C-alpha cells in the first residue's frame, strides 16, 4: 500500500490539465502510441468539440520511479470550469494529493485559486506545476512568485514542464511520488468504499467508480449499499488504464470501477458507502455535501410523444451528473416537461446538448431564472424558481433575490472597464487587493445578473484576461417585478421574466420588439404586450397580411368599395376571435438575449 499514490490534477480552464494527463499516460505506458490521441480522457464528443473537460475521469497506471520502486498511480483528470466545481470536489475526496497546474504565461487565475482552496480544506498535499514553459510568453519566475503571493503555497522549486512537448513531465512524476503521501486505511478492517461517480451503461446497468478506504473488495462478494440497505452481487470489478480492465479484487487505497447489475438508477447514489453484507462496517463514510442548483429553466420536448423518453433520459443523465435537479412541470403554451436546476449557464447548455445528442430528443428551453425568496403578506416564506409560480403582486410582502460573491482576478489595465461592468450589473465592491500587476476584486452582484451573461461580458471587456469564481452568499430584499407577455391579450406563461423594477420598462420594450421580429405574420393583427400586473408597459403589433379586395373594381361607385372593405374587416375580426398564434422556438429564446446589447 505504501506504493500507491492517489492524486487529482486541478487547474484553471485551458492551463493544460488534459494534455498533461495524456503525457503521464504515455510515459507510464497506459496506451500504445497507436492508441494515443489528444485528450484521451475527454471521452464525450461534446468535450472534444468544445475542448473542455466536463466529467472527471480516472486512470490507474504503473510508474517505475528513479529509486527502482514501482508505484501505482491512480489519478483523476478534473474539469476547470466554475460550473463543474462540484465534479472537482468529488474527485478530490478520493485523493491524498493534487497537482496544481498553472500556465507559466497566464499566471494564477480565479479557478486555480478556488480549486486549490478546496484541496487545502480537504487537507490534501498540493504540488505546484508550471506548465507551458515552451511558450515565448512564459515567465516562470513571475508566476512562481504569484503562486506564493496569491495562493500562499511555496512554489520556489515548483516543477517546470511543457505538457505539449513532454519536457519535464518525468520530473513531475518524481515529485509526485516523493511529496504525495500514500493512502491510509486498514486492509483487515470491514470494507468501506466511497462511490465517487457513476454512469449508466445500456448493457451492464449502473457502473460505479469507487475508492476503497478500508478493507478489500473481491469479485463475487455480496455488497451492501449503506444508505438503502440493498444487497447486490459484485459481478465485475477492475481499473481503468484508460481502457476498462477486469481485476479479481480491489485493495485498500485503490480506485476502480464496479458493476453490480443495478438496474435501478437510484440504486447506488454518488457519495454513498459500499460495504460487505456478511461483515458490514459500523458507519458510512462522510459523503459529499449536496450542491444547490443556481439556475433553473424549463425543458420541454417539441413533440409530446417524446415525454416518456425524455423522462428516462433525464434519469440516466442525473445518475452521471449528481448536481442536476429536475421535477415535472406543465405549461399552457408548451405542454408537459420538466423544470431543471443547473449550476450555471454552461452546465445548462451542456446538459441540453447531451440530451439532444445522446438520447436523440428535440427540446425547447425557457429562459433561465434564479431562485427568489418571497415573503407573502401572511408571513409565509416560499422559494420561487419560475416566474409563473410568483404569487400576485398584492400578496407579496417582500421579494429577496440571491446575491453572489464574485472573486475576480485581472491585470491592472482592465480594472476600470471591469468596475464599470460590475456597477452596471448592480454590484457592490467589498474588497480589492493588489498582487504585483494583478488585482483581486471581490464584488457582491445579484445572481440573476451573474448567470445571464456576466462571464461573457467580463471576458470581452478584459480581452479574455479576467477570470471569475462565484458562490452564493445570501438573499437580499430587492425591488423585483414580474414582466408578463400577452399575445392577443392572452398571457403566455413560458415568456414571463422576473427583473428589477428600474430595468423593467426597457426589458419589456426590448422583448416586445424582439417578439415582433420573430412571430410570423398571420391573416389578422397580432398584438404583443408586456405588462407588470395589470399595467401595460410596452406594445407592438405584427401587421396582418391582407388581400387587395378592390383590385376587381375598376372605377365604380365608392359605396361598393366601402362595402367590400367593411366585409373584409368583419371577416378579419371573426378570424381574430378564433385564430391562435403559433410561436416559433426562437421566440422562447428571445428572452435570453434581452439586455445583451448593454442595457
Curated annotation (Swiss-Prot):
Pfam families: EFG_C, GTP_EFTU, GTP_EFTU_D2, LepA_C
Keywords: Cell inner membrane, Cell membrane, GTP-binding, Hydrolase, Membrane, Nucleotide-binding, Protein biosynthesis
Origin: domain of life: Bacteria
HAMAP family: LepA (MF_00071)
Topology within the bilayer: Peripheral membrane protein
Stretches assigned to the tr-type G domain: 2-184
Any single GO CC term annotated in Swiss-Prot or TrEMBL for this entry: plasma membrane
Subcellular location: Cell inner membrane
An annotated GO BP: positive regulation of translation
Residues annotated for GTP binding in this entry: 14-19, 131-134
Disulfide bonds: none
Function: Required for accurate and efficient protein synthesis under certain stress conditions. May act as a fidelity factor of the translation reaction, by catalyzing a one-codon backward translocation of tRNAs on improperly translocated ribosomes. Back-translocation proceeds from a post-translocation (POST) complex to a pre-translocation (PRE) complex, thus giving elongation factor G a second chance to translocate the tRNAs correctly. Binds to ribosomes in a GTP-dependent manner.
Organism listed in the record: Enterobacter sp. (strain 638)
Keyword Protein biosynthesis listed: yes
InterPro entries in the record: EF-4, EFG_III/V, EFG_V-like, EFTu-like_2, G_TR_CS, LepA_C_sf, LepA_CTD, LepA_IV
Gene3D superfamilies: 3.30.70.240, Elongation factor 4, C-terminal domain, Elongation Factor G (Translational Gtpase), domain 3, P-loop containing nucleotide triphosphate hydrolases, Translation factors
Reaction catalysed by this enzyme: GTP + H2O = GDP + phosphate + H(+)
Protein name: Elongation factor 4
CDD domains in the cross-refs: EF4_II, EF4_III, LepA, lepA_C
E.C. designation(s): 3.6.5.n1
A GO molecular-function descriptor: GTP binding
UniProt keyword Cell inner membrane, yes or no: yes
Family recorded in the similarity comment: Belongs to the TRAFAC class translation factor GTPase superfamily. Classic translation factor GTPase family. LepA subfamily.
Amino acid at each position: 500500500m505504501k506504493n500507491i499514490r492517489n492524486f487529482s490534477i486541478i487547474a484553471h480552464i485551458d492551463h493544460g490539465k488534459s494534455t498533461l494527463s495524456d503525457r503521464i499516460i504515455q510515459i507510464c505506458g497506459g496506451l500504445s502510441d497507436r492508441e494515443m490521441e489528444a485528450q484521451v480522457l475527454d471521452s464525450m464528443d461534446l468535450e472534444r468539440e468544445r475542448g473542455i473537460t466536463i466529467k472527471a475521469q480516472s486512470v490507474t497506471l504503473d510508474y517505475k520511479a528513479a529509486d527502482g520502486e514501482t508505484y501505482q498511480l491512480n489519478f483523476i483528470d478534473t474539469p476547470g470550469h466554475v460550473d463543474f466545481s462540484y465534479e472537482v470536489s468529488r474527485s478530490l475526496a478520493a485523493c491524498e494529493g493534487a497537482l496544481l497546474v498553472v500556465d507559466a504565461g497566464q499566471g494564477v487565475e480565479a479557478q486555480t485559486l478556488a480549486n486549490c482552496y478546496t484541496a487545502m480544506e480537504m487537507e490534501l498535499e498540493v504540488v505546484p506545476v508550471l506548465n507551458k514553459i515552451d511558450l515565448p510568453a512564459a515567465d516562470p519566475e513571475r508566476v512562481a512568485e504569484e503562486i506564493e503571493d496569491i495562493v500562499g503555497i511555496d512554489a520556489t522549486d515548483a516543477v517546470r514542464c511543457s505538457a505539449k512537448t513532454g519536457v519535464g513531465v518525468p520530473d513531475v512524476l518524481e515529485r509526485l511520488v516523493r511529496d504525495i503521501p500514500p493512502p491510509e486505511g486498514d486492509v483487515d478492517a470491514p470494507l468501506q468504499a466511497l462511490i465517487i461517480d457513476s454512469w449508466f451503461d445500456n448493457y451492464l446497468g449502473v457502473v460505479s467508480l469507487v475508492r476503497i478506504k478500508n478493507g478489500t473488495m473481491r469479485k463475487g462478494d455480496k455488497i451492501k449499499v449503506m444508505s438503502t440497505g440493498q444487497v447486490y452481487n459484485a459481478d465485475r470489478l477492475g481499473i481503468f488504464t484508460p481502457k476498462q480492465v477486469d481485476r479479481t479484487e480491489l485493495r485498500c487505497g485503490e480506485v476502480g470501477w464496479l458493476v453490480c447489475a443495478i438496474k435501478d438508477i437510484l440504486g447506488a447514489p454518488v457519495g454513498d458507502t459500499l460495504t460487505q453484507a456478511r461483515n458490514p462496517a459500523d458507519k458510512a463514510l462522510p459523503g459529499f455535501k449536496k450542491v444547490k442548483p443556481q439556475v433553473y429553466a424549463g425543458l420541454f420536448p417539441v413533440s409530446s410523444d417524446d415525454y416518456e423518453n425524455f423522462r428516462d433520459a433525464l434519469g440516466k443523465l442525473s445518475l452521471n451528473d449528481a448536481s442536476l435537479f429536475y421535477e415535472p412541470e406543465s405549461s399552457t403554451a408548451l405542454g408537459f416537461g420538466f423544470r431543471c436546476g443547473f449550476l450555471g449557464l454552461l452546465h445548462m447548455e451542456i446538459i441540453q446538448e447531451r440530451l439532444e445528442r445522446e438520447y436523440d430528443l428535440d427540446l425547447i428551453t425557457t429562459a433561465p431564472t434564479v431562485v427568489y425568496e418571497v415573503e407573502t403578506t401572511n408571513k409565509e416564506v416560499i422559494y420561487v424558481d419560475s416566474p409563473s409560480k410568483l404569487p400576485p403582486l398584492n400578496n407579496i410582502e417582500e421579494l429577496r433575490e440571491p446575491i453572489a460573491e464574485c472573486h475576480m482576478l485581472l491585470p491592472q489595465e482592465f480594472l476600470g472597464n471591469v468596475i464599470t461592468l460590475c456597477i452596471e450589473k448592480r454590484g457592490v465592491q467589498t474588497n480589492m487587493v493588489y498582487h504585483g500587476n494583478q488585482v483581486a476584486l471581490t464584488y457582491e452582484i445579484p445572481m440573476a445578473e451573474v448567470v445571464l451573461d456576466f462571464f461573457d461580458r467580463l471576458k470581452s471587456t478584459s480581452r479574455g484576461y479576467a477570470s471569475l469564481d462565484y458562490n452564493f452568499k445570501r438573499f437580499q430584499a430587492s425591488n423585483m417585478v414580474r414582466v408578463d407577455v400577452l399575445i392577443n391579450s392572452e398571457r403566455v406563461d413560458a415568456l414571463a421574466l422576473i427583473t428589477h423594477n428600474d430595468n423593467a420598462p426597457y426589458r419589456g420594450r426590448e422583448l416586445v420588439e424582439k417578439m415582433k421580429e420573430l412571430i410570423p405574420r398571420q391573416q389578422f393583427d397580432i398584438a404583443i404586450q408586456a405588462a407588470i400586473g395589470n399595467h401595460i408597459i410596452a406594445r407592438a403589433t405584427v401587421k396582418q397580411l391582407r388581400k387587395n379586395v378592390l383590385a376587381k373594381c375598376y372605377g365604380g361607385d365608392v359605396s361598393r368599395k366601402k362595402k367590400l372593405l367593411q366585409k373584409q374587416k368583419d371577416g378579419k375580426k371573426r378570424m381574430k376571435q378564433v385564430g391562435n398564434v403559433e410561436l416559433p422556438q426562437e421566440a422562447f429564446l428571445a428572452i435570453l438575449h434581452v439586455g445583451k446589447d448593454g442595457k
